Regions:
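Loop/turn-to-beta-strand initiation segments
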Residues: 79-84, 114-116
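Extreme N-terminal, non-catalytic leader segments
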Residues: 1-9, 73
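Beta-strand-loop-alpha "switch" segments that mediate conformational coupling across diverse proteins
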Residues: 149-217
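Glycine-rich phosphate-binding P-loop
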Residues: 9-26
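Short beta-strand-centered segment that lines the nucleotide-binding/catalytic pocket of NTP-utilizing
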Residues: 33-48
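Switch II (G3) loop of P-loop NTPases
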Residues: 81-99
Length: 236
C-alpha cells in the first residue's frame, strides 16, 4: 500500500458549531494512539485551540500572506505526523478561496497527502448548502460531517440530520453532562492521559460518565481512520 500523510481540516461557516471541541478531541485521540499531532489555529485573537495545546498548535492569521505561507506550506510536508487545522468561522471563506485559487488539493494529492474535511454542521439552512458546494468543488476530497450536540442545537433526529449531507461518513459528539464538564479543568486536562491513567481522586460517577463520552467519540475516530486506510487501496 502506498504510504500517505493526512491533513484534517475541521471547519464550519458558523460559530458555535463545535469546531474547536472537535479539533481538540481529534488531537487527544492521536495522543492516545501515541501519534502527537501538529495543529494550526486560524483564530489569531482568542486562539482557543492553540491555548489548549501550546506546544503543538501554531496560530496562523490567514488574512495575511505571511500567515498563508506559514499554514499552507507546512500542510504540504509529507511525513507520518497527522496535521489538524482549526478553521475559525471568520476564516472559513478565505481558507476555501485559497484552496481553490492555489490548487492546493491537487498539489496535496500529487504529494500523497490526503485532506480530510471534518465539517461541523448545524441546522441553519446555509450549513447544508455550503457542504454541498464544497462537495461539488472538491468531489474527491474526503468529507466527514460532524454533529456536536454540546455546541449546536439539533431538534431533528441526529442520524436523519446527518444523512442529508453529501457524505456517508459522519461523526456524532454527544453533549457532555454539565456537572461532569464543570468537574474538569478544560485548559489543562488531557483526555488521552485520562483514558490511560484515570485519576483516582475524581468522583467515580464523573470518571465513568467522562470515560463513556470519550470512548463513544474515540471509537468513531477509530472507525473513520480504518475506513481511510481501506480507501487508500484505490491509490495503489
Amino acid at each position: 500500500m502506498r504510504p500517505r500523510s493526512f491533513v484534517f481540516v475541521v471547519c464550519s461557516p458558523h460559530p458555535r458549531a463545535g469546531v474547536t471541541t472537535t479539533a481538540t478531541l481529534l488531537t487527544e485521540y492521536f495522543a492516545w494512539r501515541g501519534l502527537p499531532a501538529e495543529g494550526f489555529d486560524t483564530d489569531p485573537y482568542e486562539s482557543a485551540f492553540a491555548n489548549r495545546f501550546p506546544n503543538q498548535v501554531e496560530v496562523t492569521d490567514i488574512s495575511t500572506i505571511q500567515g498563508q505561507i506559514s499554514l499552507f506550506d507546512k500542510l504540504l510536508v509529507f511525513d507520518d505526523k497527522p496535521r489538524i487545522v482549526d478553521v475559525w468561522n471568520r476564516s472559513f471563506q478565505k481558507f476555501f478561496t485559497i484552496l481553490q485559487e492555489t490548487g492546493f488539493a491537487e498539489e496535496a494529492r500529487r504529494l500523497s497527502i490526503e485532506i480530510v474535511l471534518i465539517y461541523c454542521a448545524d441546522e441553519l439552512p446555509a450549513s447544508l448548502v455550503t457542504a454541498k458546494q464544497i462537495s461539488m468543488l472538491w468531489p474527491d476530497m474526503t468529507m466527514i460531517v460532524a454533529a456536536n450536540e454540546g455546541a449546536a442545537e439539533f431538534r431533528a433526529n441526529v442520524a436523519q440530520f446527518l444523512a442529508a449531507f453529501p457524505t456517508r461518513l459522519n461523526l456524532h459528539i454527544r453533549e457532555l453532562d454539565q456537572q461532569v464538564s464543570r468537574s474538569i479543568n478544560k485548559d489543562s486536562f488531557s483526555y488521552a492521559e485520562f483514558l490511560k491513567n484515570p485519576p483516582f481522586d475524581m468522583s467515580i460517577i464523573v470518571r465513568s460518565a467522562l470515560r463513556k463520552w470519550l470512548v463513544h467519540v474515540f471509537t468513531q475516530f477509530q472507525r473513520l481512520e480504518q475506513q481511510q486506510v481501506i480507501n487508500s487501496t484505490e491509490y495503489l
